Each structure stands twice: as C-alpha cells, then as structure tokens.
Amino acid sequence: MTRLYQPSQDWPACTLSYRHFHLLWTLPLCAVLFLVARPFLTKLDRAKLILLPIIAFVWTTPWDNLIVKNRAWFYHRHCIWFTIGYVPIEEYFFFVIQSLISTLWCTLLTRWALPNLYLVPSSPKRRRLATPAVVVCMLCFVLGLKAAVPETHSYYFGMITWWSSLPLALLLWGSVDFVSNMGVRAGLAPFALSVLAPTFYLWASDVYALRRGTWHINEATSLNVFPIPHLPIEEMLFFLVTNLILVSACFTFDRCVAICRQSVAENAPPLSPSYLPLGSLDTYTKLWAAFVRSDRPPVATSAASASVEPRDLAASLQVLRAASKSFNAASLLLPWDLRTDLGCLYAFCRVADDLVDDDAQGLEAKSSNLDVIRAIVDAIYADSPEAAPQKQPSAQPVSDRIRTLLAPVALPDKVKQDTRAAAASIAPLTRYIPKRLWYEMLQGYSLDLLFEHPDADKRTRLRTMDDLVEYSQCVAGVVGEMCTRVILGRCGGAVPLELKVDRTIAVPSTKAAMAGKALDLTRADDVHALLYEARRMGVSLQLVNIARDIVPDSVELRRCYLPTDMFDKQDARMQDALLAGHIAVRSQHTTTLEEKELVQPRDVRKYALRLLRVSRGLYDQAYPALAQIPNRPARAGLKAACSVYAAIGTRIEAQTETDVAEGRRARMSNRDRMLRAVSAVYFGV
C-alpha cells in the first residue's frame, strides 16, 4: 500500500495551479451567472447567497482538513498559494464558489414557479417521502462511519457518505415532499436540473484538474473505480451530494418563506422574498418555526389575512394568462410574492371589466353586475383597516361572503368561480390599497356603460383631453397607484391609506421627469411623487391601448375615446361616426351605408398617431421613476412590463396600409416581447 505521508512518484506532475484552475473554470461561470441573475435577485436569493456559502464553509472545513491530513487528497506545493491548517487557501475558496454557482443556477431555474401554490395542509401524507429519506440518510451515515477507516480503500468514500448524510437528512425532511407536491414541471424537473447541470460541469472541471496534477486522489484511500476516465467514483459522489445539499437548501428556504408569508403581522409585512431582514433574530426564529411545522395552517378568514388559498391563486393566475399575454409574460420577471399580489390584483380588474363589458347582455344587466362588483368590494373591505373601528369583524370567511353575493346573479358558474377566486385573492391587499381606489376604478367602468345609454344626452362623450385623462386615471392610473402601494407595502414601507395623490395630469405635462432625483420614501412628499408618477405611467399606457383599439372599439362596442377637441375642423363629424360604428373596415360587410358616409380607417390613423405622441411624452417623464422602486427585481419586472406595453405604440406606427384598412389591432410577437423585456431589464431602455 502507498504510504499516506509521502506522495508517490507515479502521481502526475502539476501543470495547472489551483489559482489558474479557478480562473479557467469557476470564476468565469460564477460571474456570468451573477450578471444574468442580478436584476432578479430578491432579498431571499441574497440571503441564500450569503448563508449557504457560510454554512458550507463551516460544515466542510474540519472535514476537509481531516481528509487532507489523512492524505486522501494531495496537492503539489508549487501549485498552491498557501495552506490554512492542512488545506490550501484555494480549496476554501472552492467551498464558497461552488455554493455560489449552484445557488445562482438553482435561482435562475426555479424563480418562475410560485412556491405558495404548492403548500399542502397537515395530513399523514405530508411526510410520505420525508420519513423514508431520513431513514436512508441515517443508514448511510452509519455505513459511512464504518467505512471511513484511515489507510483503507473505503476511507474517502466513507468520509463523503457520513459527512453528507446529516445535512441531507435534515434538508430532505424539510423539502422532499414539498418538491414532490410541485409536480414534474415546477418541482422535480427544476430540482433535478439544478443538481445535475453543475454536477456535470464540476465533473468535467475535476477531470481537467486531475489530468494536470492540480490535485490528486490517493489510490490507497480510494475504491479506484472510474466510471469516467480519470474521475474516481468518490469525486463523482462528492460533487453530486454537495449540489444535492445546496439545491435542497434552496428549496427548503423557498418552502419556509412561503409558509412565513401566510402569517399576519400588525406592524410589519410577513417574511417574503421582498422582505427578509437578516439582521433580525426574529427572522431566523420564524424561518425555523416554519421549517418544523406543517406547510399550511388553517387559512385565516378575515380580509387581513396575509395569504391566499392556493386554489384561488391558481384560478386568478389562469384569468391573468387568458386576459393579457403581455402582462402575464412581464409578471414572470417579478419576485414570486409580488407576482402573486399583482397578478391577483390585475385578475380582479379583468374579471370586473369582463362582468361589465363581456358577460352580460344589455345595459340593465351590465349595470346590475357593476353593483355586484361594488358589493364585492364592500364585502372584501368589511374587516379591513379602513372599516369602522367599532364594527366587529365578520365571522364569515371572505370567500363565502362573495359566494353568497354571487349566488343570485345570472352568470355562468365558471364566471362566478373566477370572480369569487379573484376577489378573495385580493383580500390580503386591503392593508395596502384604500377602498376608494377600487371605487375610482368602478367609476371608469360606469363611464364605459354610459356609452350604451338609450338617452343620447346621457351617453358618454369625451369633450376635452382632460376628460380623456380623467377616464384613463380611473381605469389605468389607479391601477398604477395600486401596484406601487402593494410593492412598497410588501417591502416594509406601507403607504398610509389616507394619503391621497394629486390626480391632475396636464397634457402635455409641465411636470419634470424624476431622472437623477433620489427619493426618500420615508417622507410623505416623496411617496406622493412616486405614486403620482405611477399614475402618469398608467395614463400613458392607457393612451396606447386607446390608440390601438380606435377601430375595434367603434366597430364592436360603438365607443370612441378620442375627445372632441382632438379632431380637426374638417373631421368635426368623425366622433359621431365612430360612436355609431360607421367606419369602412374591409373585413366588415354588414353596413348598409354608402362608402362616402363611412369614416375611412386611414383618416382615423392620424389621431391614433397623435395620441401616441401624447402617450410617449407622459411615458418618457414617468419611466425614470421606476428606478425609485425599492426592490431591484420589482424594478426589473415593472420596466419590462411598461416597456413591452409601450412598444405596442411602435407596432401601431409600423402598421401597413392593409393592416390599417382592415382595422387590425397592432400586436407584438413573443420574440419582440422578449427582446423588449431583455432590453428594459439589462439596459434600461
């Protein structure tokens, strides 16, 4: 047997120093992964990047020193810088850099899923995989200890086995059933790829280093089994189990934070990817409590609950996917907690809009549905901070209240289910969104309904640009304020519900852009300024929407949102024609009017372009304010969402004569959406 204290002459000479190995294999990959992930890194992700390398370093250091002391590994002196204990400094660096690589890679793969969708209530099946996993790990621990006898061929294999079994037992107990509940697409596949991809990469790097003598595995303490040429089975096992530990830890963090987010706190938001104060001992106490308890306690029944039923959340997100591909795609860039909140908020807006516009026939039925929506808002806010102090909270769950309200309404069951789910899902947001903002949105829907009023004198007719801005404030500017309030609240800086925002937006605006001006969001004036810009952005994007849909709104809905004072003198009758649907669209052949009495789409186009110029002016002034959002991944997602939607204006400008004549809506391809989103996220344009 080769003596452990003296290297063999048969071992390869070192032609690659450990430092150069890192420059070739680990540092470039880590840098690339960090640059790609940087715009999306939440406070939870940063916690993983801080805590996991520290834990890995502490757990591995004594074990690695023992391994090297017993000559399972060997390093040529001229290939390393210096040692601390028995281990080269570059090896300590490897502990950290591998943890960063695997954690960043796992973050990029798993950020698209919503962990809160997969929390399950306590049941005997809760630990159906965890218990066997712990038993297997403990068995491996015992066998590893028996095999880890110095100066034997099983030593290195046994050391890896017992050393990895303890953390794996703990982490698999906390994550394996959670991953299983997520299914193949959201859980098992990302989990496997998160483990295997860095494992294969590190196997390749290990072969490269072993062939060049950067380090050497002592044959006397190895099984000398080489599934891959030059790569001992112990090295393959080491990188596999270390990546398995790191990925299990990432999923365990996600599960614990998802559980914590269900809690209700009076003076602070629940722990989430957007709010995770690492400097507070209370954070670690809550995380540990979440680790050891059931995934989902009974859901709170009041509107103050911090959580959303997974079934309601899934239904709301399905509404979002069907209603707006652009918003749904851009929302994927948000942290999963904000994607949950803003997705539910947008879903309720869409459901309410559909109840008023699409799911009822006739003005009377639509007006009745508007009253139902108003009653739903009242029911949601019955237990909110805005409710009268002397009023006792209702014992009836929010979801049941809404179901009761919808029961007598003549709507399809699917519509009722979607409405109830979306409404119940916004209940946790009542602590951040004032009730009056929902009423403001309903005022905009009322204006839409008045387009159909039988009395011509009472029908909606926008006279001035101020009227158009007022309408846009109601249906879009208010949504911008809501979203901003939710983001600030979830990040720990809740806006007082009584704070009202100036609704005066001059077109063209005389207010300066916010570029280069840092806001102090602890000051009411600066918070007001940010909310104002959020409203201005909402109005800007609504004008894009109106410009895109001038022809379809006229043909399908008999509506015209262009104000009277926008039309040139020679087009004085165009507004009446658009309100009557008298527009010469090639694809429409049902009209009995002569061609000369119809408005030509090409004549309408100039007003669409004029409206786009107004929109672009507001957009250019409001866009810099996104940099003031105190949450980097939220900034990335909002920049992408706003940029993608504003780019529809560019598609309108690029429409062909045929597109215009046929009244086609300008649309963006998935490729164009992706390019715009990437440009906004990484380059800010």
Swiss-Prot record:
Family matches, as InterPro entries: Isoprenoid_synthase_dom_sf (IPR008949), Lycopene_cyclase_dom (IPR017825), Squ/phyt_synthse (IPR002060), Squalene/phytoene_synthase_CS (IPR019845), Trans_IPPS_bact-type (IPR044843)
Subcellular location field: Membrane
Transmembrane segments: 21-41, 48-68, 92-114, 129-149, 156-176, 187-207, 231-251
Entry's Gene Ontology cellular component terms: membrane
Chain segments annotated as coiled-coil in the UniProt record: none
Signal sequence region: none
UniProt KW Transferase keyword: yes
Keywords, comma-separated and alphabetical: Carotenoid biosynthesis, Isomerase, Membrane, Multifunctional enzyme, Transferase, Transmembrane, Transmembrane helix
Region (Phytoene synthase): 262-685
GO biological process, one term: carotenoid biosynthetic process
GO molecular function: geranylgeranyl diphosphate synthase activity; intramolecular lyase activity; lycopene beta cyclase activity
Gene3D superfamilies attached to this UniProt entry: Farnesyl Diphosphate Synthase
Disulphide-bridged cysteine pairs: none
NCBIfam families in the cross-refs: CarR_dom_SF (TIGR03462)
Protein name from the UniProt record: Bifunctional lycopene cyclase/phytoene synthase
Source organism of the structure: Sporisorium reilianum (strain SRZ2) (Maize head smut fungus)
